[in-house]
A protein has these predicted regions:
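Extracytoplasmic substrate-binding proteins
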Residues: 30-36, 40
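Surface-exposed cleft-lining segments at the edges of enzyme active sites
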Residues: 56-69
Length: 182
């Protein structure tokens, strides 16, 4: 299991940050959270934001509106992830909303992404082919919003052990390590 966060940038593009530890992910998340507005009566129309424990019991209610964009630009979000020694991945670049491609109309060459994510549906439809020319490693995931969706996306990894550092090496294809979506 890798610790991670998904940031909605000021351009409303999603960026996935994966980290070596939960502490690093939490630190990055707190920096993002500090830029988000508080929950108001109007924002409550978007629904409740409960904090649940492992047994499904409500423990608290989130006071920050998590469904809005952070004030970080795309470059700043990637910089934040990297400042916590994380991997920055352009989320679901094949989707028509909240992707770098849909929001900017092109893939920025000046942003230091470690990989791109293709949605699991996009993989099934062969959309990954149009992004291979970007020269970045590809991953896929379930991008789950419901429990039933967990596990829909799969990648194959060739690594020496199951660790964050080995995953990073697989993305970079170092010494025979590999990451593939198909």
């Amino acid at each position: 299991v890798l610790a991670g966060i998904e940031i909605t940038t000021s351009e409303e593009a999603h960026v996935l940050g994966l980290f070596a530890s939960a502490e690093a992910a939490m630190a990055g998340g707190e920096a993002v959270k500090a830029t988000l507005p508080p929950v108001t009566e109007i924002s409550k129309r978007f629904g409740d934001q409960f904090v649940m424990d492992a047994e499904g019991t409500t423990r608290d209610e989130e006071k920050t509106m998590l469904s809005t964009a952070a004030s970080f630009s795309l470059e700043q979000a990637v910089g934040l992830i990297k400042s916590h020694d994380g991997l920055a991945i352009a989320s679901h670049v094949d989707r028509p909303s909240h992707s770098v491609m849909s929001q900017l109309g092109l893939f920025p060459q000046n942003v230091n992404f470690d990989a791109i994510e293709i949605s699991w549906v996009g993989i099934q439809l062969g959309r990954d082919m149009q992004f291979r020319g970007l020269g970045l490693p590809m991953v896929t995931s379930s991008d789950s919003h419901f429990l039933s969706e967990i596990g829909n996306g799969h990648i194959s990894l060739m690594m020496k052990e199951a660790s964050f550092d080995e995953f990073a090496s697989a993305l970079k294809a170092i010494e025979g390590r590999r990451c593939s979506v198909a």
